[in-house]
Amino acid sequence: MRNHIANKIEAKDKSLSKILNDERFKIDVFQREYRWRRKHIEDLISDLAISFLSNYKIGDGLDKYDSYDSYYMGPIVLCENNGSLSIVDGQQRLTSFTLLLLYLNHLQNSLGIAKESQKDLNKYLYVTKGGKTTLILDIDTRESIIKHLYENPTEIFEGDLEDESVRNIIDRYEDITNLFPEDIKNADVLPVFIEWLIFKVVLVEVRAFSMENAYTIFETMNDRGLNLSPTEMLKGYLLSKV
């Protein structure tokens, strides 16, 4: 029975809301820094804006987003093992969506949108389980920079800038701030965009139940625009055997 479960693989379409809600993800085997560059963020925001604005009509309210076309972001690969859920492939996109949600959270406040029209985005950033509150993407080295961007994004970060991921997170958040389209940056459109982003942006969640199967899937898939070096792939494979 255990072997049957270990060999099981599930694939489901899931909205961003369903993926980032009440889960805690580890990135503890296939170690990979956050490496997206400005071009990746530019492409992501452009694609999202084009898809959303091709559906949105002036005057649309929050009740209209559900009739809009979905936007598919491709697969992510997860491994569920011993009660823990690890991201094997897809953390570049999920980290980028986390940064976008942080930005949108501040933007909806700064635009003076009525509280009843604001979306509670905290539940897509943090999760509380077993009395412990952590980032949904539970990576210790990123906790301080994400907290900083959540609380004081306009101030200079005084934490550790030696970490490649921390530096890239700061730069990519700034890119989001500079690149987010003016057509969506107003109190009428933004709430509809946020609802659409959360519920109509869809990823294919591929879930394996053993690291061996997860690694096999991992070899055939990659984050958008990023390739792993042979050394990184070998490291991931060796760590999966520990």
Positions of PLM-derived features:
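Glycine- and hydrophobic-rich flexible loops that cap the catalytic core of alpha/beta enzyme folds
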Residues: R2-V242
